[in-house]
Amino acid sequence: MISLSNATLMRGELVLLNNTNLSIHNGQKIGVIGRNGSGKSSLFATLLGQLALDQGELSMPEGTRCAHMRQETEASSASALDFVIDGDQQFRRIEAQLVEAELAEDGARIAQWHSEMDKIGGYDIRFRAMQLLSGLGFSAEQFERPVASFSGGWRIRLNLAAALMAPSDLLLLDEPTNHLDLEATLWLEQWLNRYQGTLLIISHDRSFLDHVIAYVVSVEQQKLTLYRGNYSSFEIQRAERLAQEQAMLEKQQRRVAEIEDFVRRFRAKATKARQAQSRLKELDRMQLIAPAHIDSQFYFEFPKPERLP
């Protein structure tokens, strides 16, 4: 299980998460939802160890293999096929050890590394990489083309293929369908439905999320809230929660108005003074409910005005 406890995360002076908690269980497939700038990508960076919490604790099982989809790719002379295979770093390490053993003509080490290669399915890795490329819309003629020859959108597809190639217990995908056509999106849905690890996806594609996820983490008002169900279910649950919060707020406001009216009318009367005092204590103990609202999609920051002459 992965857990965030009393987590606070800031970027500069902006508070993204404030004393929030989240538990993610093995094998859960989760959509991460929130307005732009709410902290979704920063949450991913924290899980990857690229950012540290300002307060609180992140707990993750030792040895958890994390894979993620990079958002940029530098021009490279490597072929598309080799780029995707590079996503499996364990394969590349064993491959390098095997080459070294063969150059040294060390029979025992050669046998050892062939055995390790067999354990990770390394002998069919080219076939698996070709399957990923084909599923994401690459033709066989493009497999050997250098990465530098592809446009930005196709390089993002290569990043996605490399992330899927990496053996992982935790897979983080940030807007994976942005540069995919319908056929590639449907293929990706099927691939992710077969994925056995824990999956977190940031996406604005509601249909895609509905077909892949079984949970939603909402990043809202500096908190992480877990909902059970796909995106459509999340929207219904959130609307119901907001309606309940609004009803509770209105009920509390009516009670506050009743207390204030009673105190105003009877505080000066000796026969009612004790009751008025009791109601004032009730008001002091009352935890005021904040108005229910959804985070705005917009964030405005105004500089401090200069002093007038």
Where are these regions (language model features)?
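ABC ATP-binding cassette signature C-motif
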Residues: M1-K251, F302-P309
